């Protein structure tokens, strides 16, 4: 071994080592891989062309794709340079019997390795071999099909197998910058969710078709997104508490900032029911006679309003009492006659209205039939005897005040012991409403609102009496220093001015401390 063989080893990384082994600038590596575009594809849509045209540089486009691009951008999609539509050259590709592009002179099929050229003056496309042998070497610069003369500069290279840079899709200007022309038909088709379903079987397509026929999601979504109508606040429906929007916006950044307190609006039904103070009266005309009913509108306003509205709507006309149990109840109010149908006047079930002073005691109590708590609709029943165990289960809203003989005749009708259905039909022919307290309440509310419209709000009066913000400044009396001092304040009366006389002041008389008399006692 030689001496001093490690003498040049350093205890640190040298510049040459860092550059070549450990760091330094690396040689450029192309970030994108080469992607070859076939010769029969449009350089803009990257799809097979139908109406081929080319630029003077030999870049091929489809006429249907390049025209909208030029109208919007006016540039060459592959290079980004300016391009005029007049400079485009229409190409005439020849096809063989199998539908393949080929040279019309040598009949050789064009492939990705064929040297393809086009003549500018005619647009005919040939192989370079045919043009070289029959035109260039023969010094006969005439088109091989039309015999039209051309120059050497009119030969445009469409594809050169030795130079494929213009066929590299990764280097296209519109691909790098993600530029494209949006087709209106395609944009409209994208709005349909089925546009994104590429491969579906027949069962899926049939299911989707049925869904689209019955789908109402857009209407429901539009209804939910629509802002609720703001109710008008007046002296009648204004609550003694606010909406709480000020405090909510103060404590939560998700709320819209509010700086003024607004009174909450009392529900219209709650307001109307405050004015209902009377009983309602309805007559049921049955095939067994008439039943006169008194309704407790002042105690159960919601239930009574539902019954009166349905009677006025002639909802019960032609319905039957589908259930009758002797010494218990008779039930009706179902248009289907099955005991499972019927709906309320508002189209949805409403809550129970239990009152401690109303009980199923005695004969002829009118009560609501339901299928559970807060499921009142249109069905009702009339008791034949006391049923106190039904309290707080069914809403009592009236009683029979006339026609007990009719009620007895209805009870005497025999029923099927299995279904409790009367063997003889007990029918409600028509209904008559004699007293409707809700119409009177609506008229009274309308009259009260007319009165309040002519009265000025007390808060508005206070605001009108307050001075405007622009008139709150002090009054000026002159210009310059002391312009705010009233002239009368600078004048003093003669009594207030100090006396200039030299008269000596009178000496104060000391009070005597003698005994005196008893006059001060």
UniProtKB/Swiss-Prot annotation:
GO terms for cellular component: cytoplasm; nucleoplasm; nucleus; plasma membrane; spliceosomal complex. There is a cross-link at residue 216 (Glycyl lysine isopeptide (Lys-Gly) (interchain with G-Cter in SUMO2)). It catalyses: S-ubiquitinyl-[E2 ubiquitin-conjugating enzyme]-L-cysteine + [acceptor protein]-L-lysine = [E2 ubiquitin-conjugating enzyme]-L-cysteine + N(6)-ubiquitinyl-[acceptor protein]-L-lysine. Residues 278-433 form the PPIase cyclophilin-type domain. Its EC number is 2.3.2.27. Pathway: Protein modification; protein ubiquitination. Residues 447-521 are annotated as: Disordered. Residues 35-108 form the U-box domain. Residues 447-462 have a biased composition (Basic and acidic residues). Keywords: Acetylation, Coiled coil, Isopeptide bond, mRNA processing, mRNA splicing, Nucleus, Spliceosome, Transferase, Ubl conjugation, Ubl conjugation pathway. GO terms for biological process: mRNA processing; protein folding; protein localization to plasma membrane; protein polyubiquitination; RNA splicing. The modification N6-acetyllysine is found at residue 483. Residues 465-478 have a biased composition (Polar residues). Its main location: nucleus. Component of the minor spliceosome, which splices U12-type introns. Within this complex, interacts with PRPF8/PRP8, EFTUD2/SNU114 and PLRG1. Interacts with isoform 2 of BSG. Interacts (via the PPIase cyclophilin-type domain) with CRNKL1; they may form a trimeric complex with HSP90. This is RING-type E3 ubiquitin-protein ligase PPIL2. The gene is Ppil2.
